[in-house]
């Protein structure tokens, strides 16, 4: 069976302190990870800075972590979804 990138990624819904830390750990361990949050301005800042300066300042996101403000895209991209 051919590998499907959708099933290999994990989406974390919630970009607060716990959601960001969880997404960070998942990505750091080699899991393609998507992080979604409801505050579009905050999500844009995290995507631009590659870190969550509100909750985890100084922790640069791993390459495997993608921040996205589009809930539909984030949910559609992963088989595994964590809501925090």
Placement of each model-derived feature along the sequence:
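NAD(P)+-binding Rossmann beta1-loop-alpha1 motif at the extreme N-terminus of oxidoreductases
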Residues: 2-59, 68-69
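Rossmann-like NAD(P)-binding element
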Residues: 59-84
């Amino acid at each position: 069976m051919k590998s499907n990138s959708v099933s290999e990624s994990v989406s974390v819904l919630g970009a607060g302190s716990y959601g960001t830390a969880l997404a960070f750990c998942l990505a750091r361990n080699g899991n393609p990870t998507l992080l979604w949050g409801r505050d579009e301005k905050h999500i844009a800042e995290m995507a631009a800075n590659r870190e969550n300066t509100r909750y985890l300042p100084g922790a640069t996101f791993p390459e495997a972590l993608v921040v996205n403000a589009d809930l539909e895209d984030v949910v559609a991209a992963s088989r595994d979804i964590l809501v925090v």
